[in-house]
Amino acid sequence: MFKVAIIGSGPAGLSAAARAAALGLSHVLLEKTDHLSDTIYKYQKGKHVMATPSNLVLRSDIDFEAGKREVILGTWDDQIAGHKVNVKYMAEAKSIRGTGDAIPGSVQQIVSRARDGTKSVREIQRHTPPYAIELTNGETIMAENVILAIGTQGNPNRMRCPGADLPHVQYQLDDPAEYVDEHIVIVGTGDAGIENARGLAEDPAQRNTVSILNRSTEFPTAKDANVKALNADHEAGKLMIRTESETKSIEPGFITLTTRDGELRIPCDRIIARIGSAPPRAFVEECGIEFSSEDRSAFPKLSPVFESTAPGIFVIGALAGYPLIKHCMNQGHDVIEFINGNT
């Protein structure tokens, strides 16, 4: 039986685990892959990671400052090993259930929607801790408290148009240098989409023809520096920004766009869609955690100390609605302090 089980080894989970180790709490950090911090691990190679907001003081037993992806991952690997954090790799949580007494009047309603628009409602009775965390390999981990730090990147928003399920549509770019002499279309003009487009167009020797689609003429979700750099690349002829353009359909070798001037069919060998992500709602609700609304992008209901509607299960990081790394790390530190009785 652990005092706390932390699920997910992103910035929030790592910070929580490091604090638990520093305080001498019995703990386990469950990571479904064979490496730490999968979200940052999947960042584009060489990506510069920002440390915003700059005026926020970091509360964590592991370090973080702006720098290259590879440097940050190396620092965290070294420090987690130095803190002797109890990490269990290849440990994906399948379910979390309370094994204590039933909580009177505490029921989680789960609404399921069919494709025809009909919906059904079922109820889950909440139970007190300790919690049994069943892993996909059949193993069960017992813990008095659970911290969910699983983020949202494993649940990307999918394209919805004819041909969206074709194999050349992808939602991740690891290394731009892998792609040569291709017509590539980036869908999404947030920071990830812009960085992917610029990375693919950076080296003329790769001979890629890169377009990035923008439904409007503005870039409201991207950092100013990224927008300026993208516009500069467009002006230099390295890539093309297609404004007021949306995907109508996809077929092998081509993509058809709906534009201000009508339909446009252009060559396309690969589509990289970076259109955001949403909380893994089904899994979270099965844990007895209620969401703030029925909207797909809604986040779980949480107390001021990030405790969910399931007593003893805490939600931190991007899954709690805080995508910035420093915020995530502070939350991991603070939740462990709360669990340890330091309110």
Task: List PLM regions with ranges.
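Rossmann-like dinucleotide/flavin-binding elements
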Residues: 1-29, 172-219, 283, 304-343
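Flavin (primarily FAD) binding-site architecture
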Residues: 148-164, 277-289
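Short hydrophobic core segments
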Residues: 7, 140-153, 185-187, 266-276
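FAD-binding beta-loop-beta segment adjacent to the flavin cofactor pocket
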Residues: 288-314
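Extreme N-terminal leader/targeting segments of oxidoreductases
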Residues: 1-4, 120-124, 154-155, 161-172, ...
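Glycine-rich nucleotide phosphate-binding loop and flanking beta-alpha elements
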Residues: 13, 95, 154-155, 193, ...
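Beta1-alpha1 glycine-rich phosphate/pyrophosphate-binding loop at the start
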Residues: 9-85, 194-225, 291-296, 334
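A Rossmann-like FAD-binding core segment of flavoenzymes
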Residues: 53, 71-135, 140-142, 204-293
